């Protein structure tokens, strides 16, 4: 991995970090509210998911939220059962994700993206998992010359993204510009790991347009050089 390039992107992020704290705090508050009410054993799954999706409307892609609501509406008991298995932390993550996708696809006859599964994981355990956006991940992998090459959207892509995000989280957790905010939020009751992982997800979202701008600039100047 190109750590120099990662350091550059982190520097860009840190230069605007203070202006993003209010938005990050909104994310932390929203997820804390969701966790305080989480219960898959209630009579009806749909109202629960509708509440979660309404609260997360500004945090994630609307199409993924619609997928969650639609699944809960059409197959409440099936989804409840599958979610209990997805959240069984005694089973390796890759097996849980693929099993959940197979089970859901068997009753819907429709493709379930890994990004939607990541959202289910994130809603339940934001201190352990991240929102997974394949578009952002592919761009970041290219920019950092990451050791794993992505071909399509597979379980390998998801697991590789989580590994990269964990590596970034370790670096951010040691950064003197960001750790005071993490410690301050932990001191008033927020889960420290959750705060850190939300920052990592925010970083990935923040750097995506920077990466795309650089790629477009490089492509333009490469074409001009070839045309000479």
Annotate each PLM feature:
Residues 117-124, 138:
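Contiguous, well-ordered alpha-helical segments that form the cores/surfaces of helical PPI scaffolds
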Residues 1-110, 126-228:
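An N-terminal alpha-helical hairpin/helix-loop-helix interaction module that forms a charged
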């Amino acid at each position: 991995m190109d750590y120099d390039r990662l350091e550059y992107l982190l520097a860009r992020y840190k230069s605007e970090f203070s202006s993003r704290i209010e938005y990050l705090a909104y994310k932390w508050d929203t997820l804390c509210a969701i966790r305080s009410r989480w219960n898959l054993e209630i009579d009806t799954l749909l109202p629960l998911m509708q509440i979660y999706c309404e609260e997360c409307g500004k945090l994630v892609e609307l199409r993924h939220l619609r997928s969650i609501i639609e699944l809960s509406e059409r197959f409440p008991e099936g989804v409840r059962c599958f979610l209990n298995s997805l959240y069984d932390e005694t089973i390796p993550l890759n097996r849980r994700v693929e099993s959940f996708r197979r089970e859901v696809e068997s009753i819907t006859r429709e493709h379930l993206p890994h990004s939607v599964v990541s959202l289910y994981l994130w809603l339940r355990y934001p201190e352990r998992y991240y929102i997974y956006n394949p578009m952002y991940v592919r761009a970041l992998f290219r920019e950092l010359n990451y050791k794993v090459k992505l071909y399509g959207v597979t379980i390998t892509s998801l697991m590789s993204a989580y590994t990269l995000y964990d590596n970034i989280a370790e670096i951010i957790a040691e950064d003197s510009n960001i750790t005071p905010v993490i410690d301050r939020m932990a001191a008033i009751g927020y889960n420290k790991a959750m705060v850190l992982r939300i920052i990592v997800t925010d970083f990935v979202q923040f750097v995506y347009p920077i990466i795309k701008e650089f790629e477009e600039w490089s492509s333009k100047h490469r074409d001009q050089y070839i045309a000479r």
